[in-house]
């Protein structure tokens, strides 16, 4: 993202504007409705509540599809940002399951005129529900 506005560009979130635990920015995945209450798996094995606004190398989100379609898993890596704030996770399984590596969760990024912000992401979409141990092994293998 290059700022061609002719003035500073302030990139923030509802949390940087004062709303707690609402730091959704960047690439935002809204999971299927059927995944409400799905399992969140992360590096170091924190619970989903412990992940909100925190840094982790990777997270996985698993859920069952409606009726007879089985389940699936999304493995997401935090990625990188050329800006100073560390990428933090905006993640929840209820009331709406979502997953977002957030570059400005609780700290605004100020992009000066002519400056660029570079973000990298890696997401892996898997066709079944993966257990924590096997997902950790895959994350180790695929880590960028």
Residue ranges and their predicted role:
Residues 3-5:
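Asparagine-centered strand-capping/turn motif at beta-strand->loop junctions
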Residues 75-144:
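Beta-strand-rich recognition/accessory modules
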Residues 8-83:
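Active-site/ligand-binding surface loops and adjacent short beta/alpha elements
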């Amino acid at each position: 993202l290059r700022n061609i506005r002719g003035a500073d560009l302030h990139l923030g979130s509802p949390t940087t504007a004062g709303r707690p635990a609402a730091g959704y920015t960047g690439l935002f995945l809204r999971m299927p409705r059927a995944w409400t209450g799905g399992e969140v798996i992360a590096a170091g094995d924190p619970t989903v509540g412990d992940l909100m606004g925190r840094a982790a190398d990777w997270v996985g989100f698993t859920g069952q599809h409606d009726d007879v379609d089985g389940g699936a898993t999304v493995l997401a890596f935090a990625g990188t940002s050329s800006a100073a704030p560390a990428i933090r996770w905006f993640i929840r399984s209820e009331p709406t399951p979502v997953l977002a590596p957030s570059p400005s969760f609780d700290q605004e990024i100020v992009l000066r005129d002519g400056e660029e912000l570079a973000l990298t992401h890696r997401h892996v979409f898997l066709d079944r529900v993966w257990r924590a141990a096997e997902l950790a092994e895959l994350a180790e293998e695929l880590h960028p």
